Amino acid sequence: MKIYNVMQYGAKGDGKTNDAFSIQHAVDDCAKSGGGRVVLPSGYVFYSDSIRLKKNVDLHIQKGATIKATSNIDGYIRPNKLINDPKTALIGNPVTGKPSFVFIYAYEADGCSISGEGTIDANGHAFVARKDQYYVTGDFYPRPTVMYVEKSNHISFRDFTVVDAPFWTLHPAGCDDVLIDKIRILNDLDVANSDGIDPDHCSNVRILGCHVTCADDCICLKASKGNSEYGPCENIIIDGCTLVSTSAAIKIGTEGVGDFKNVIVSNCIISRSNRGLSIQIRDGGCVENVSYSNIIIETRRFCPDWWGTAEPIVITTFNRDENTKSGTIKNISFFNVTAKGENGVLIHGNEDNIIEDVTFENCSIELTKTSKWQCGLYDLRPCLDYGVESYDNSAFFIRYAKDVNIRKTKTRWGNLCDSYSYAIDAANVENLNLYEFDGKSAKENTDDIKIDRVKLNYKK
């Protein structure tokens, strides 16, 4: 592999001089020669405008090296500035999936990669402002995406650390054969929308051994409207990750005009998070064949500005607005999942789209009050007809579903609050199948299981 050291292209690495020209020159020469490695050497801080990564080029950030994003918004690549949508062109749009400003950008760059044990400092606090002690507002724009790679195959991201993202951190869109291996993302837990890893209409993705802390979803599979030309989000493996989020640790949706299928999530630990595992479909896409196994989840409530009410597992499908329709969700399984938090499992379909074939086996769900924030709520946002709804909290809260199987699973209660209630609260469920279920009500003289228009099959 041919090496291109940015110092030989005039980079200073003093943390003050803008080294973008030197880094880009090295990338361009590397690409012209057929590919190789562009090295940011150890011991230097490279302050830089945006970089455009190219085909078969590995941007290698050595251990002890940092590339720091400029605070000057005019120094960022604007891949969608010509889009006939002023909002998208200026600030980006999470539903369309099209970013406004990007720090490291690639398009049609097969074989590109970022590697090394160095650091990408995204300089996020140059683009946000604090709203209160719990929340850094998303109302200050533009906020750049850190890495956006579109229509590029056989790409990889290995070993490096990202800190202080102002917006989404790693967003591959329309890519096939994506490896994300042992990267660290350490974002401010108060900065809204600082997603960790967002594969969007991507296929054959492996996310392995990563540690992510962020103030939005740590890992979020998307099928956004703006990238719908690229097909479904499918064949995804997430394994061996440790995750902390003020939103959902691992989510499918809500951006889902396309389909999601064949997803395996295993051997992950989720701690200090608002939600654990979440499937939220709002734009007509469908989800099928998703398996979660060997996962530990710890949830708690955060400030009400954050969506979610500490549900360890969420499966919902609703219309986002008047112009969208909910999609279908089926064949979802949970094996050996241990969850402890302030709320229970939420499964909520609707009359038009019943959630089908959901299985829990060898799982443990414990509700225990740990924060100062209100209980007795379920958060169904974003959707047309519901918001944050008031209900007693149950270990399993199920609405509009079919063939829900709960096997060899137990529910428990820790520190109680007044809203803690049933082991299972189910309505409009066809075939709720319980086998060796061990669950009691949180309250004396209250049924363990509450059902309404439910066909229940119970084998102790």
Q: What is the predicted function of each stretch?
A:
Residues 1-460:
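Extracellular/periplasmic carbohydrate-active domains that bind, remodel
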